[in-house]
């Protein structure tokens, strides 16, 4: 059985400890709890920080890394767009500066696997270099677990 791994990166406007990031930091725990209770959620990366977010340094920038595993694309989509997470997603420009797209990568893994940040960043580099493929794909240009391109099913964002 395969599960869907997803990673996204976002360049923070400021460190998470700064006042301008306060609204986001306060929302991290509640939104993560919603994810964990969502149908189809399997796992997410947690850091030792109190807010559970993983931040990397990239040059002089703070880059937030989100990494999770889901039973299916539909489960991930429901959380991203149909839960309270969607409201924060629509306001992301308050906390994050634009990055080289894409900033989200998906790939299929064996059930029970737990991808790491290094693998996620490698998959994202592969996607940015080679475009969507069964090894690394996007929310809009997906691949099935067997490697076939996903058919364009329209999923509502409401």
Regions found by a protein language model. Give the residues of each.
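Short S/T/G/P-rich N-terminal loop/turn motif that feeds into the first structured element of a domain
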Residues: 1-61, 75, 102-158
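Exposed, tryptophan/tyrosine-rich binding patches on extracellular proteins
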Residues: 70
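Extended, compositionally biased
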Residues: 64-67
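Soluble secreted/lumenal catalytic domains
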Residues: 61-62, 80
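An amphipathic, aromatic/His-enriched active-site/gating alpha helix that lines ligand/cofactor pockets
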Residues: 73-101
